[in-house]
Amino acid sequence: MPSQKIRIRLKAFDHKLLDQSVGEIVDTAKRTGARVAGPIPLPTVINKYCVLRGPHVDKKSREQFEIRTHKRLIDILDPTQQTVDALMKLDLSAGVDVEIKL
């Protein structure tokens, strides 16, 4: 796999958990001899939900909730077979969504 690139995109609601997972991936890739570009922070998506506080009347009384989705992008350039094997065996946290493109 000499001229390929692995693009890893991570999403999580907790940025500390996300940064910890990114660190593990970068350390694993560098340890096996691949070049790493990133982590690149992508824009945070903020979903806001507005709900009525009371069950019956008072439309003016509302409450807002938000969910922030933090994202990071990592490019692994010139991956070796050991890099791919190490990334497959890597155990990340349950709160992190990982998308891998070759």
Swiss-Prot record:
An example of a GO molecular function for this protein is: tRNA binding
Task: Extract the Gene3D superfamilies matched here.
Answer: Ribosomal protein S10 domain
What is known about its subunit structure?
Answer: Part of the 30S ribosomal subunit.
- Name of the gene this protein is made from: rpsJ
GO cellular component assignments = small ribosomal subunit
Purpose: Involved in the binding of tRNA to the ribosomes.
Q: Which residues form a coiled coil?
A: none
Which named protein is this?
A: Small ribosomal subunit protein uS10
Q: Where is the signal peptide?
A: none
Per the UniProt entry, what species is this protein from, by scientific name? Geobacter sulfurreducens (strain ATCC 51573 / DSM 12127 / PCA)
